[in-house]
A protein has these predicted regions:
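Conserved active-site alpha-helix within GNAT-family acetyltransferase domains
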Residues: 100, 124-143
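Conserved acetyl-CoA pyrophosphate-binding loop and the N-cap/start of the following alpha-helix
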Residues: 93, 97-105
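Conserved GNAT acetyl-CoA-binding A-motif
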Residues: 110-122
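Conserved beta-strand segments that form the floor/walls of ligand-binding pockets within enzyme
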Residues: 53, 83, 88, 119-121, ...
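Acetyl-CoA-dependent GNAT
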Residues: 3, 7-14, 18-79, 85, ...
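Active-site/acyl-donor-binding loops of N-acyltransferases
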Residues: 143-149
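Active-site acidic-Proline motif in GNAT/NAT acetyltransferases
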Residues: 90-92, 96, 124-125
Length: 149
């Protein structure tokens, strides 16, 4: 299956938002050309935010959202980590290597930014995702308790 991976910016955000709608509601909507809000434009201009989407037949079918967090101190020498915040592929498109391609994009970003590594969190109740990450070279490096406020 032919596909491309595109960085999301204000020019293609409407198409990306259509995919987010698809994920949230379980059905596609007509492509929207709604204007991108100033708040979203500012978010997309964040130099440490990287969002990439897989495009197949003119629509996005998956994405990865990454953020770069710098580390200070002599141990890190100013180099931080890439954190994968979210990785999703529409269920009917899974099994085509898109998630691996998106994770490869995170690897490329790590090299481009000279980051120390890539970190991500995976739910212990999501063994399919765990196997994907292991197949892409990720290893379990401890357990954590996830807390939010």
């Amino acid at each position: 299956m032919n596909y491309t991976i595109e960085k999301i910016d204000e020019n293609n955000y409407s198409l990306f938002d259509d995919m987010v709608f698809w994920r949230e509601h379980g059905n596609e909507r007509e492509p929207s050309q709604t204007e991108v809000s100033e708040q979203m434009k500012n978010e997309l201009l964040n130099p440490d935010l990287y969002v990439y989407a897989v495009k197949v037949d003119g629509r996005y079918v998956g994405w990865i959202s990454c953020v770069y967090i710098a580390k200070i101190g002599s141990r890190w020498n100013g180099h931080g980590h890439i954190y994968v915040d979210e990785l999703w592929v529409e269920p009917s498109y899974r099994g085509n290597g898109f998630a691996k391609a998106l994770l490869k994009k995170a690897d490329e970003l790590k090299n481009e930014l000279n980051a120390m590594g890539i970190r991500l969190y995976v739910n212990v109740n999501n063994p399919i995702a765990q196997k994907l990450y292991e197949a892409c070279g990720y290893v379990e490096d401890g357990r954590a308790i996830f807390m939010e406020k």
